[in-house]
């Protein structure tokens, strides 16, 4: 599982605005001239000092950060009461001057109450040269220029100003902090993500503007609800085409789909090979795009399908290998041909994005490993009973039963180590109808028998083979149905277990010295329904931590809505499988060489923005149909 930083992304440069002009609707959040105002300001650690001092236009706040242990030194400013009600405004602004002799970047953060691990804030950075002034702006609902946490402006509980850990002493002055803008205003240059209604992304009737057409060696005429495209025959236009881009300020979010369909009629007198492409920013035909082509007979109509599920394979030894594309960030569609001197004309009907079922799964899937050899089935659970087989699995245990060998996450009521605070509860794992189900929920209250944590809202569980089954090398496969509730973070993964002779649990599970975390299938619901990642972590989780992986494994589900993920682990080599197809490989001497055990988890959260839980969709379930492990005789 990826370990996320408290301040992920804080240092992407934000939108800057110079000058300290105040509008009529501005609301002062803190008056530095007010007696006793210091009580509303706190440092963010021992490496920050602050003072209210006299300025040219009244009192100001001076903040000094020094090198030390705090990675994000700065100040926290509280309201004069429980919260600020800024529902009449659209943003918070801070007028800041850099008093240092070096360039600095200051983050302005605006918070709602709540668990910090759910990131209930918006933030923006301001970069200032030595001696320069500027205004940092945080627009409600946006962070670092992109849509972020949906902040409630009526419940602003804190404003923070901080920097990264400085190499030498730095100082900045805050002249004013205010709420500004009218409620509902969007920041200039902001982007709205739009999901297709009824699957239709691009239609040519109401709402379509011809400004969305970029003719690249073509002529396009809108006729009814279709586009008539005539491609150039000029020798200079080798690949003439028409690009249909999103409206200004819009990105198409196709994360709920796994392919795009272009219905095209060939109006020419000869067969024509038509290329269709779905583009992100910076698409170059190989990266940041998905594409397909088809030959259409003269006078015929055909649907060209551009799948997000491709045969491009991630290679851990090749930078930016595999399928580099984001279905949630589509900027437009390109329809083009290869020019051969013959006139080509087509009609393009409305373009649709769909969630299609995949082809029939390979016959071998679930029955044997994907490569030949002398294999033995060493572990299997089809979850056909009514209770979990405790000879194979470990669940969160009551505290009275724990020993020094107990892995802390397997203690009933222990906090989840990943994502938003939740507690592990054994009863959240159940076996029914031939499936293992991991449940994450928000109960009205945490059961009395469990330890009380003031920030705990959710219950989840963890199911592992720790202390019951381990294996070095082999093929590990599981068929799973993923949850649909935003905020869920299910995973099928392996961790080291060197056995009791290695000592206390953390020595058994150390990812150094031949150990490694294998994230075979790791899924954030916010990615969309057909997209997961695989990752590998080693050498601990602190300064020496290393990782590699891919975030672009797109897939079809089978007829029942399941996917099957597999890992072929060989000495010095791993191969990733999705629904029986190779999706990734990595050859490296550092690949794990110690036994590993199986884990299923579904914490809340993840990395990046958009991981907040939709409580109305709870409980959420991560469903496992089976898990099977084979060992090759030569590795026993």
Task: List where the protein language model places each region.
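Bacterial N-terminal signal peptides
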Residues: 8-18
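General helical structural elements
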Residues: 6-8, 262, 632
């Amino acid at each position: 599982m990826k370990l996320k930083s408290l301040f992920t992304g804080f240092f992407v440069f934000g939108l800057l605005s110079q000058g300290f002009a105040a509008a009529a609707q501005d609301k002062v959040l803190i008056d530095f001239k007010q007696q006793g105002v210091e009580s509303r300001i706190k440092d963010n650690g021992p490496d920050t000092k602050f003072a209210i001092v006299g300025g040219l236009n009244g009192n100001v706040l001076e903040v000094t950060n020094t090198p030390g242990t705090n990675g994000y030194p700065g100040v926290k400013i509280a309201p004069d009461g429980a919260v600020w009600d800024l529902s009449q405004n659209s943003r918070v602004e801070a007028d800041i001057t850099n008093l240092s002799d070096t360039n600095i970047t200051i983050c302005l953060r605006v918070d709602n109450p709540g668990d910090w691990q759910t990131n209930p804030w918006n933030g923006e950075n301001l970069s200032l040269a030595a001696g320069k002034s500027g205004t940092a702006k945080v627009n409600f609902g946006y962070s670092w220029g992109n849509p972020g946490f949906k902040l409630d402006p009526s419940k602003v509980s804190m404003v923070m100003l901080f920097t990264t850990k400085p190499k030498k002493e730095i100082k900045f002055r805050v002249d004013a902090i205010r709420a500004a803008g009218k409620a509902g205003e969007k920041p200039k240059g902001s982007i709205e993500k739009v999901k297709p209604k009824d699957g239709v992304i691009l239609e040519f009737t109401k709402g379509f503007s011809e400004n969305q057409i970029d003719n690249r060696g073509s002529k396009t005429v809108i006729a009814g609800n279709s586009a008539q495209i005539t491609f150039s025959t000029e020798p200079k236009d080798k690949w003439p085409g028409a690009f249909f881009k999103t409206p200004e300020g819009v990105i198409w979010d196709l994360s709920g789909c796994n392919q795009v369909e272009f219905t095209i009629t060939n109006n020419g007198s000869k067969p024509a090979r038509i290329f269709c492409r779905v583009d992100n920013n910076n698409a170059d035909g190989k990266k940041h795009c998905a594409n397909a082509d088809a030959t259409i007979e003269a006078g015929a109509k055909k649907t060209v399908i551009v799948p997000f599920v491709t045969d491009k394979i991630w290679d851990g030894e090749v930078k930016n290998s595999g399928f580099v594309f984001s279905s949630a960030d589509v900027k437009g569609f390109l329809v083009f041909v290869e020019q051969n001197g013959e006139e080509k004309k087509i009609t393009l009907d409305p373009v649709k994005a769909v969630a299609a079922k995949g082809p029939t799964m390979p016959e071998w899937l679930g029955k044997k490993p994907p490569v030949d050899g002398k294999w033995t089935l060493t572990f299997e659970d089809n979850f056909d009973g009514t209770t979990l087989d405790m000879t194979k699995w470990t669940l969160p245990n009551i505290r009275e039963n724990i020993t020094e060998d107990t892995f802390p996450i397997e203690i009933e009521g222990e906090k989840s180590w990943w994502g938003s605070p939740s507690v592990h509860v054994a009863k959240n794992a159940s076996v029914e109808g031939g499936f293992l189900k991991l449940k994450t929920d928000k109960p009205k209250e945490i059961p009395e028998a469990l330890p009380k944590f003031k920030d705990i809202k959710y219950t989840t569980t963890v199911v592992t083979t720790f202390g019951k089954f381990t294996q070095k090398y082999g093929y590990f496969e599981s068929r799973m149905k993923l949850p649909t509730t935003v905020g869920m973070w299910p995973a099928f993964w392996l961790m080291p277990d060197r056995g009791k002779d290695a000592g206390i649990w953390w020595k058994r599970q150390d990812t150094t010295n031949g150990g490694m975390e294998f994230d075979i299938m790791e899924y954030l619901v916010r990615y969309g329904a057909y997209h997961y990642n695989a990752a590998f972590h080693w050498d601990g989780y602190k300064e020496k931590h290393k990782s590699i992986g891919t975030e672009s494994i797109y897939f079809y589900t089978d007829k029942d809505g399941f996917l099957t993920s597999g890992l072929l682990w060989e000495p010095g080599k791993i191969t990733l499988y999705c629904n029986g197809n190779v999706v990734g490989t990595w050859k490296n001497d550092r690949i794990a060489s110690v036994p590993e055990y199986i884990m299923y988890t579904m914490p809340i959260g993840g990395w990046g923005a958009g991981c907040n839980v939709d409580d109305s969709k709870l409980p959420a379930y991560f469903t496992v149909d089976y898990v099977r492990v084979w060992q090759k005789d030569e590795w026993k």
